Amino acid sequence: VHIAQYLVDFANSLNFEISIIDPRGYFASEQRFPDLKIINKWPEEAFKEIETNENSALIALTHDPKIDDPALQHALKNKFYYIGALGSKKTHENRCKRLKEAGFSEKEINLIHGPIGIKLGGKSAPEIALSIIAQLVSETHNNK
């Protein structure tokens, strides 16, 4: 949650349009994320409520495959320009195996930034959020 809170602050300051998807209302709450679009539904249902396209980005931060994997699958199928997922190299290896089993090609899976963020060396929530937003901004400019 802390990484997401810092990330939202950075993204807001850069004028990104933000939607938070998390079925767990105790994580994705108005108290934690005031003035943001919060969808407390599973990704399969949540993506029906927002318009996404090749100009969309996805940052998966839950560490829960039941939440992150469907979101990543949606992003891959809809050709989001940026897709990133939090987790260690081992977590990402396991994620890639699951996506391959779900029918995604190696080329598609390689579009996911995992572990997410540029290597700054930091371990704190604000440092991780900064590394993620830096990678997102870089991809945003490369996408134009």
Residue spans for each PLM region:
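Glycine-rich adenosine-cofactor-binding loop
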Residues: 1-15, 20-22
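Residues in the short beta-alpha loop(s) of Rossmann-like NAD(P)-binding domains
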Residues: 22-25, 89
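Short loop/helix-cap segments at secondary-structure boundaries that form the rim of catalytic
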Residues: 26-36
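Conserved SAM-binding strand-loop segment of SAM-dependent methyltransferases
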Residues: 36-42
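Short amphipathic alpha-helix with an adjacent loop that forms part of the alpha/beta core around
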Residues: 43-54
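Structural motif
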Residues: 56-57, 82
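Rossmann-fold NAD(P) dinucleotide-binding segment
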Residues: 67-80
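Adenosine-phosphate binding glycine-rich loop
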Residues: 80, 86-144
